[in-house]
Amino acid sequence: MNLHEYQGKQLFAEYGLPVSKGIACDTPKEAVAAADEIGGDGWVVKAQVHAGGRGKAGGVKLVKSKEEIREFAEKWLGKNLVTYQTDENGQPVSKILVESLTDIDQELYLGAVVDRGSRRIVFMASTEGGVEIEKVAEETPEKILKAEIDPLVGAQPYQGRELAFKLGLEGKQIGQFTKIFLGLAKLFEECDLALVEINPLVITPAGDLHCLDAKVGVDGNALYRQKKIHEMHDPSQEDSREAEAAKWELNYVALEGNIGCMVNGAGLAMGTMDIIKLSGGQPANFLDVGGGATKERVSEAFKIILSDDAVQAVLVNIFGGIVRCDMIAEGIIGAVKEVGVKVPVVVRLEGNNAELGTKVLAESGLNIIAATSLADAAEQVVKAAGGK
């Protein structure tokens, strides 16, 4: 689960990190009032969406008057912001962050992720702040400094100082950076984060370090014990189908093809998408109904898949292990009847009660195409969707 910048900065402040004074606003009137409360003669206004590249898309602006703030808020509130990280529809803007201006002498980068290879939290720092860290990693990987956090002892002050020295910091900046490093590590662990970035972490003309941006991603599997953070969830930033799928504990990711996929198991789902692609088709989604699929979840999965108008055929690929194929077959029949499926449905069943499941489908009287193998299923569904 991702957080908005203003929410991330609220957490930063709670953990002692230096952030700008800012107010998240819902209306142009609130945005103008926020400028009065913050004070000064210049501000930064930022559209709040779960995507990078806002500045290049016009979603971040330095303003010198309250009239400019009002115009910016009127331009973006209730509209969609399209950046290089969004799809062509963009993401809706429901809040504008109004912040005090911060003068910048230098931009740095500081972030942390869970490294699956080392099974540890890894901090990354770089002198190349203000640009995409992925670009830095690709073009000049030697400019990215790393520090692994030992899970037994946690982040240590010496690691912060070591990174600070390598970044070329000096004097009071060493202590400031170490404090930010330790605060960020504590936040990462206590709030079950999956990713956190400060880009840029700036040095002001006075020589102080300041967190100018906040990108925070929370481990969705830990939200049950992060009630406060869970309340920050903004479903408007997610694909509506993905949000609906999450309610039913379905793993759904929208894609851009025309062949809907319903599979049990993430690995089998990825393999199914691969073979559709190899057969000349384009998957419309990734959908894993899981090992504990029920008739109700299968029915909801169909509804979600068919809510995508681009879908011209559906492939159901089930390997019966924990879940019985005959139960899945009953769910498919119920869903086809309830939803009124108008597109071709190709079903491949293998494993637990596969023969019984195939028999149930055959006796249903519905227009469901039974496949004899995964390769056959892919060929059938591509053909049904109008492919080769």
Curated annotation (Swiss-Prot):
<feature type="domain" description="ATP-grasp">
    <location>
        <begin position="9"/>
        <end position="244"/>
    </location>
</feature>
<feature type="binding site">
    <location>
        <position position="102"/>
    </location>
    <ligand>
        <name>ATP</name>
    </ligand>
</feature>
<dbReference type="GO" id="GO:0000287">
    <property type="term" value="F:magnesium ion binding"/>
</dbReference>
<feature type="binding site">
    <location>
        <position position="264"/>
    </location>
    <ligand>
        <name>substrate</name>
    </ligand>
</feature>
<dbReference type="GO" id="GO:0006104">
    <property type="term" value="P:succinyl-CoA metabolic process"/>
</dbReference>
<dbReference type="GO" id="GO:0042709">
    <property type="term" value="C:succinate-CoA ligase complex"/>
</dbReference>
<dbReference type="GO" id="GO:0004775">
    <property type="term" value="F:succinate-CoA ligase (ADP-forming) activity"/>
</dbReference>
<feature type="binding site">
    <location>
        <position position="46"/>
    </location>
    <ligand>
        <name>ATP</name>
    </ligand>
</feature>
<comment type="similarity">
    <text>Belongs to the succinate/malate CoA ligase beta subunit family.</text>
</comment>
<dbReference type="InterPro" id="IPR005809">
    <property type="entry name" value="Succ_CoA_ligase-like_bsu"/>
</dbReference>
<dbReference type="GO" id="GO:0004776">
    <property type="term" value="F:succinate-CoA ligase (GDP-forming) activity"/>
</dbReference>
<feature type="binding site">
    <location>
        <position position="99"/>
    </location>
    <ligand>
        <name>ATP</name>
    </ligand>
</feature>
<keyword id="KW-0460">Magnesium</keyword>
<comment type="pathway">
    <text>Carbohydrate metabolism; tricarboxylic acid cycle; succinate from succinyl-CoA (ligase route): step 1/1.</text>
</comment>
<dbReference type="GO" id="GO:0006099">
    <property type="term" value="P:tricarboxylic acid cycle"/>
</dbReference>
<feature type="binding site">
    <location>
        <position position="213"/>
    </location>
    <ligand>
        <name>Mg(2+)</name>
    </ligand>
</feature>
<feature type="binding site">
    <location>
        <position position="199"/>
    </location>
    <ligand>
        <name>Mg(2+)</name>
    </ligand>
</feature>
<dbReference type="InterPro" id="IPR017866">
    <property type="entry name" value="Succ-CoA_synthase_bsu_CS"/>
</dbReference>
<dbReference type="GO" id="GO:0005524">
    <property type="term" value="F:ATP binding"/>
</dbReference>
<feature type="binding site">
    <location>
        <begin position="53"/>
        <end position="55"/>
    </location>
    <ligand>
        <name>ATP</name>
    </ligand>
</feature>
<keyword id="KW-0816">Tricarboxylic acid cycle</keyword>
<keyword id="KW-0436">Ligase</keyword>
<dbReference type="Pfam" id="PF08442">
    <property type="entry name" value="ATP-grasp_2"/>
</dbReference>
<dbReference type="GO" id="GO:0005829">
    <property type="term" value="C:cytosol"/>
</dbReference>
<dbReference type="InterPro" id="IPR011761">
    <property type="entry name" value="ATP-grasp"/>
</dbReference>
<dbReference type="InterPro" id="IPR013650">
    <property type="entry name" value="ATP-grasp_succ-CoA_synth-type"/>
</dbReference>
<comment type="function">
    <text>Succinyl-CoA synthetase functions in the citric acid cycle (TCA), coupling the hydrolysis of succinyl-CoA to the synthesis of either ATP or GTP and thus represents the only step of substrate-level phosphorylation in the TCA. The beta subunit provides nucleotide specificity of the enzyme and binds the substrate succinate, while the binding sites for coenzyme A and phosphate are found in the alpha subunit.</text>
</comment>
<keyword id="KW-0479">Metal-binding</keyword>
<dbReference type="InterPro" id="IPR005811">
    <property type="entry name" value="SUCC_ACL_C"/>
</dbReference>
<feature type="binding site">
    <location>
        <begin position="321"/>
        <end position="323"/>
    </location>
    <ligand>
        <name>substrate</name>
    </ligand>
</feature>
<dbReference type="InterPro" id="IPR013815">
    <property type="entry name" value="ATP_grasp_subdomain_1"/>
</dbReference>
<feature type="binding site">
    <location>
        <position position="107"/>
    </location>
    <ligand>
        <name>ATP</name>
    </ligand>
</feature>
<keyword id="KW-0067">ATP-binding</keyword>
<comment type="subunit">
    <text>Heterotetramer of two alpha and two beta subunits.</text>
</comment>
<protein>
    <recommendedName>
        <fullName>Succinate--CoA ligase [ADP-forming] subunit beta</fullName>
        <ecNumber>6.2.1.5</ecNumber>
    </recommendedName>
</protein>
<dbReference type="Pfam" id="PF00549">
    <property type="entry name" value="Ligase_CoA"/>
</dbReference>
<dbReference type="InterPro" id="IPR016102">
    <property type="entry name" value="Succinyl-CoA_synth-like"/>
</dbReference>
<keyword id="KW-0547">Nucleotide-binding</keyword>
